A protein has these predicted regions:
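ER/secretory pathway lumenal C-terminal domains and tails of membrane proteins involved
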Residues: 1-111, 117-191, 203-589
Length: 589
């Protein structure tokens, strides 16, 4: 049930399908999307379906000189029309599209036509009941029609009463504000570029630029589209108040079918070094002064007129650093000294695709004059190994020439993050009680709460306690738990750690208690399932047990008595889990 599915509202049916519904965790039980129709629309539609298929009309005909009454099966003809509308816009589309599992969202909007067809049968169901009562009840046709209309009106009323609250987006401005927060995380000067990936990361930013006029000096670059020539053409043109992105390639070098991908062949590195050693002048003329300089690799290899050279001949690229440009760029100095070269590791990569090459081209050409960012929600598989050079500034990671994943290097600009969160961010009116937060919006709320918790922890590590407390209080006010429940995924334990380090253990205890309650409720629910469904929920059980273990660790920093109580509860639940054949990873081998 936590992943969707349907329920009837009748406990004897639902319990047999999905386990004891009374043991559902509170955040599922109280979710506004937890709707029950008691099968009323289904039953009404089936009544209409069968009535239409079997409907006949009486008529009198003369046979063998006698007047007789016969039935004409006219309903079946109409039935096939509606049925094929239902089939072709529903099941036929399912078969034709043959969608892969693990779709990013429910695709029910693709089958809207089949819902229209079934709605016709629901309407005919009303006629079917009227027709039946006219034959059985001793009432006038008008009275029967009125009574049936009133009774069957309960079906759409029930549907509306159940689904209205989880379709009500009024007073919720999260999409606009969260998109704006990404733009507000960017440097205010320098026409920054931000790489995004996917619809939910990109469209809110485009909306803010197009409609609200926010962040029009920035360029939003969607990595999913950057694989195509038409989108690269767009990036090479100015937009709003943003100049074109620094891509110098002529169109023939990135048009469709050209440089779709380029293999990474580190084995060629030694041969090139030997060539430079034996014949340096010829080598420099052919491949540039520095063979593995990013600009030279893109120019002399990837864009070579010789197709045999369309490779990346190394797994380590370099960008020579203009140190004065870095100092003027506005970025945080991640270490005491600016490196002579930026190192871009391609370790583990077998090929770079067109979008990757365009990212590298922008880095090679920008010379740190234009800040380049990657949205926090972009997966690491989409930006090569550039994460080694990130400095986080709010909801974005800034690409810098520094290697920031080594000891002693800074990878979080707390001053900019604090400024952005406290003065520039908006939170979509999440403070208003009663808002419906759907699954996708909830994920973005989680991202924001985790960001605030992470910022507070970073500030505390820098002994900036007052600013950290400001951030923690901001999270409590702007992302309240009555709209965005506190659990592990929403950053509940990080918030607790922040309050502990800030010296306010009572606030930390509130977060710990809520994380524990949610995790224990989920585990208890999984343990109540039948053997088959319990086996399917093994990974979910393991995840909740690990969350509870982490919660115990944080609880021990707050109150030993509470931590001991949690440990006892966890041991009891784990005993039940183990008794049903459950095992933790690597256990029992």
């Amino acid at each position: 049930p936590e992943h969707g599915n349907w329920i009837t509202g009748f406990s004897f049916i639902d319990d047999s399908l999905y386990g004891d519904q009374s043991k559902l965790p509170d955040d599922l039980k109280n979710n506004k999307g937890h709707n029950v129709f008691y099968c009323m629309p289904l039953i009404l539609g089936l009544i209409g379906l069968f009535w239409q298929a079997w409907y006949t009309r009486k008529r009198k005909v003369i046979k063998n000189g006698k007047e007789v009454e016969e039935s004409l099966p006219i309903g079946i003809q109409q039935f096939w029309v509606v049925f094929f509308l239902f089939f072709m816009t529903g099941l036929a589309i399912v078969i034709y599209l043959n969608q892969t599992p693990m779709q990013p969202r429910e695709r029910d909007y693709a089958y809207a036509g089949s819902f229209y067809a079934y709605a016709i049968w629901c309407g005919l169901g009303v006629l079917a009941i009227i027709d039946l009562l006219k034959k059985k009840a001793k009432l006038s046709g008008t009275a029967i029609s009125a009574i049936v209309a009133v009774i069957t009106l309960l079906v759409p009323i029930q549907m509306a009463s159940q689904t209205w609250d989880d379709h009500d987006r009024s007073n919720r401005y999260t999409c606009r504000d969260f998109g704006q927060n990404y733009l507000m995380s960017l440097q205010e000067k320098g026409n920054p570029i931000i790489f995004t990936n996917g619809d939910n990361d990109t469209f809110p930013l485009w909306y803010n630029q197009e409609v609200e006029g926010v962040g029009t000096d920035a360029r939003v670059c969607n990595l999913s589209y950057l694989q195509t020539d038409w989108y690269i053409d767009q990036m090479k043109r100015p937009a709003y108040n943003s100049p074109s992105v620094p891509i110098t390639w002529p169109r023939l070098d990135f048009c469709s079918g050209t440089n779709e991908y380029v293999t990474v062949e580190p084995g060629a590195k030694q041969q090139i070094l030997e060539f430079y050693k034996q014949n340096p002048e010829a080598a420099k003329k052919q491949f540039g002064d520095e063979p593995f300089e990013l600009k030279n690799v893109l120019k002399y290899w990837v864009r070579s007129k010789n197709p045999d050279l369309h490779i990346i001949p190394t797994d380590t690229l370099y960008v020579t650093i203009d140190k004065e440009a870095v100092k003027k760029s506005g970025m945080m100095m991640a270490s005491d000294t600016i490196p002579d070269k930026m190192v871009i590791s391609l370790a583990g990569k077998t090929a770079l695709y067109k979008g990757d090459l365009m990212m590298l081209e922008m880095i090679a050409q920008c010379n740190w004059v234009r800040p380049i960012y990657v949205a926090l929600t972009v997966g690491e598989e989409n930006y090569m190994n550039l994460g080694d050079n990130f400095v986080q500034e709010g909801l974005v990671n800034r690409i810098t020439p520094f290697t920031t994943n080594k000891p002693g290097a800074k990878n979080f600009d707390t001053e900019k993050a604090y400024h952005n969160i406290m003065t520039r961010f908006k939170f979509g009116n999440l403070k208003q009680k009663g808002l419906y937060i759907d699954e996708t919006t909830m994920r973005m709320c989680y991202t924001h709460r985790r960001l605030l918790a992470q910022t507070a922890l970073q500030l505390l590590s820098e002994h900036k306690n007052k600013k950290a407390i400001d951030i923690l209080k901001k999270a409590d006010v702007e992302i309240p738990d009555y709209n965005v429940p506190i659990d592990y995924m929403s950053g509940g334990l990080d918030m607790a750690r922040g309050w502990i380090l800030a010296g306010q253990k009572q606030k930390a205890a509130e977060y710990v208690g809520k994380v524990w309650k949610t995790a224990s409720q989920y585990l208890s629910y999984y343990l109540s399932l039948d053997a088959n469904r319990f086996a399917q929920a093994q990974n979910d059980c393991i995840r909740q047990i690990m969350i509870m273990q982490s919660t115990c660790e944080v609880a021990s920093m707050v109150d030993q008595k509470t931590a001991k109580k949690y440990e006892d509860q966890l041991n009891k639940l784990y005993t039940l889990y183990h008794g049903r054949g459950g095992q933790m990873p690597n256990a029992g081998n």
